[in-house]
Swiss-Prot record:
Keyword Iron-sulfur: no
InterPro entries per the UniProt record, alphabetical: AA_transpt_TM
Transmembrane domains' residue ranges: 32-52, 55-75, 121-141, 154-174, 175-195, 219-239, 257-277, 299-319, 346-366, 370-390, 403-423
Miscellaneous comment text of the record: Treatment with toxic concentrations of proline reduces shoot growth and root elongation in wild-type plants, while plant lines over-expressing PROT2 stop growing shortly after unfolding of cotyledons.
An example molecular function term from Gene Ontology annotations: L-proline transmembrane transporter activity
Observed phenotype of the null mutant: No visible phenotype under normal growth conditions, but mutant plants grown with exogenous high concentrations of D-proline show reduced inhibition of root growth.
Protein known as: Proline transporter 2
């Protein structure tokens, strides 16, 4: 028995042999690394980028925000490469995050990982619905000031559109041309936000960059912003995305990750820094609410943000859709009547619940903080480092082992602190605003 076989036998405990990993009803191993890179870049430059000036830079200031974003980029790339390198660990492909965790740890961690991932993706999708609703409301107030339509109404409309799109696109690889559309939409709202913010910044030289609030409030908002930093760069579904890439899967995924964390982050950096430079501590959590300019330009940007949020939600909901399709044995043509009806009921119900929660508590920054705290930190940093430590234990030096344990402990503490801060933020906002608030 060679070292590799011994390691695999050591990792796969007896409990794991009772774990049945289902085949997938979705398409895998069909996409180029470049298409996968666009999926990742779509996630990082989704309409969420319009919130980072207000949810990251305002609480952290110039030094904390710039250094934090650069560090978050580096550590996120590192953590994602760890996960990507384990995709074929043990001589088989692990097309789901929970499959990889189950193979390494056993049945209990399979379930825990699926629970963490489900919460992560569910909350991200709630955020996309809030974003889409906010974008629609922003268009409405450009032309009407009667206040007849409130944010919850627009969130409901966004939910319906997201459900229709989910029914029409059967799986992640089927996005195809929609990824190109998403890129064009992202370019539109990012360019508009940058140009209008820069114009406002030039015309309004006086602004305040001081971090606002009391000492205790600053502590909680800074901690929450740290969770927003890691939320910005991580999908929480890397193995599911990697499952779509052609062989060689590790090499191609590494290309996609390097693209995401170099070329892909530049638009996000630009809109985040310029937005904060223009408006300082008064920057809105949805940047397009701060900009001034021609009505038709702002309407175009908001409509683009709305449509891009619909596409992005489908990406982050795909693991849940894959689970439902596989569990209930969906087979045959995606256009078959029974499959259309199944997607209508299953995906429609999922979107309906997400939409209800989004309308109930439409606090975008709080959602980002809580998601980063309770799921992004554990999935992307704690679990990734510990899985790599367990899987590659015999090949790591003492220094490397200590490094991974340091990451596990540090991000564990960060996750706990950020969760406390996020819950406090939600509690404060819930007192200041009623449910179904028009924020």
């Amino acid at each position: 028995m060679d070292t590799s076989e011994a390691r695999n036998r050591k990792v796969v405990a007896v409990e794991q042999f009772d774990l049945e990993v289902p085949e997938t009803a979705h398409q895998i191993s069909s996409d180029s690394w470049f298409q996968v890179a666009f999926v990742l870049t779509t996630g990082i430059n989704s309409a969420y980028v319009l919130g980072y000036s207000g949810t990251v830079m305002v609480p952290l200031g110039w030094i904390g925000g710039v250094v934090g974003l650069i560090l978050a980029t580096a550590i996120s790339l590192y953590a994602n490469t760890l996960i990507a390198k384990l995709h074929e660990f043990g001589g088989k492909r692990h097309i789901r995050y929970r499959d990889l965790a189950g193979f390494i740890y056993g049945k209990k961690m399979y379930r825990v990982t699926w629970g963490l991932q489900y919460v992560n993706l569910f909350m991200i999708n709630c955020g996309f619905i809030i974003l889409a609703g906010s974008a629609l409301k922003a268009v409405y107030v450009l032309f009407r000031d009667d206040s007849l339509m409130k944010l919850p109404h627009f969130i409901a409309i966004a939910g319906v559109v997201c459900a229709i799109f989910a029914i029409g696109i059967p799986h992640l690889s089927a996005l195809g041309i929609w990824l190109g559309v998403s890129t064009i939409l992202s370019i539109i709202y990012i360019i508009v936000a940058i140009v209008l913010s820069a114009k406002d910044g030039v015309n309004k030289p006086e602004r305040d960059y001081n971090i606002q609030g009391s000492s205790i409030n600053k502590l909680f908002t800074i901690t929450g912003a740290a969770a927003n930093l890691v939320f910005a760069f991580n999908t929480g579904m890397l193995p599911e995305i990697q499952a779509t890439v052609k062989q060689p899967v590790v090499k191609n995924m590494m290309k996609a990750l390097y693209f995401q964390f170099t070329v892909g982050v530049l638009p996000m950096y630009a809109v985040t820094f310029i937005g904060y430079w223009a408006y300082g501590s008064s920057t809105s959590t949805y940047l397009l609410n701060s900009v001034s300019g021609p009505v038709w330009v702002k309407a175009l940007a908001n409509i683009s943000a709305f449509l891009q949020s619909v596409i992005s939600l489908h990406i982050f909901a795909s693991p849940t859709y894959e689970y439902m399709d596989t569990k209930y044995g969906v087979k045959g043509s995606p256009l078959a009547m029974k499959n259309l009806l199944f997607r209508t009921v299953a995906r429609g119900s999922y979107i309906a619940v997400s939409t209800l929660l989004s309308a109930l508590l439409p606090f975008l920054g709080d959602f980002m903080s809580l998601t980063g705290a309770i799921s992004t930190f554990p999935l992307t940093f704690i679990l990734a480092n510990h899985m790599y430590l367990v899987a590659m234990n015999d090949e790591l030096s003492l220094v490397q082992k200590l490094w991974h344990w340091l990451n596990v402990c540090f991000f564990g503490l960060m996750s706990l602190a950020a969760a406390i801060a996020a819950v406090r933020l939600i509690s404060v906002d819930s007192k200041n605003f009623h449910v179904f608030a028009d924020v």
